[in-house]
Amino acid sequence: MKFAIFGDIHANLEALQTVLWDAQEQGCSNYVCLGDIVGYAANPVECLQAVQDLGCPVVRGNHDEGAASESSLEELNPLAQNALLWTREQLSEEQRLWLRELKLVRQVRDFTIVHATLDSPGNWGYVTNRFDAMASFSYQFTQVCFYGHTHVPRIFEKDDAVRAARGTDVLLQRGVKYFVNVGSVGQPRDGDWRAAYAIYDVQAQTISIRRLEYDIETAQGKIRAAGLPSLLADRLALGK
């Protein structure tokens, strides 16, 4: 059994379609979404529908929450605010309700999923180093937890200490916990513009991060055509 685990789509339909196609080619039979389906790019409705059509477990991200609420969005940067105000106008009330009702944390089979952190999932903190990871490990009751939010693929391990694993592929070891950032489908920020997602092979007990080229020019063109800030289109090619 293989799980395709993905998140931070951010309304980038071209990237999402590429990830879902690749997951099928890799033999994935199950899908899990770590949130932030919407925000930044120009296809929030289509991306939301694609995730809903999968019928898979989903957790709420901060951009999902922003799009579904009537809050001022003052905690977000101006680019994110601009995109979310536009996104609110695109989504139906039914779609916004669906986003509002998503849980912050879920257990799927033998692993946990969250968008940001386990210690305070609704405060949208970032796990970028082993000290951040320590706090989430304290609330992790499964061997593996998958998360997103930073848009940077990373694997943290915990046995008698917490450390960042080398690379983004791992063979699970007995007695070790793993806190795994699967990267971003639609807006990577690690200097690599390619879409990212993870495959968890239950039988082989492996987790691997895949990177995929997609039709970035079309995604950029849609952002500009929608009247969204051009910087949101430009940054896709920079991977930041």
Where are the model-predicted features located?
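Short, conserved loop/helix-junction motifs that constitute active-site signature segments
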Residues: 52-54, 138-139, 172-174, 200
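Core catalytic region of metal-dependent phosphoesterases/phosphodiesterases
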Residues: 2-96
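Active-site environment of divalent metal-dependent phosphoester hydrolases
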Residues: 10-15, 39-41, 65-68, 119-121, ...
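His/acidic metal-ligating clusters that form di-metal
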Residues: 27, 90-158, 240
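Hydrophobic/aromatic beta-strand patches that form the interior of the parallel beta-sheet core
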Residues: 32, 57-59, 114, 146, ...
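Active-site-proximal beta-strand elements of phosphoester/diester hydrolases
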Residues: 2-10, 110-117, 179-183
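Acidic, His/Gly-rich catalytic cores of divalent-metal-dependent hydrolytic chemistry
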Residues: 158-240
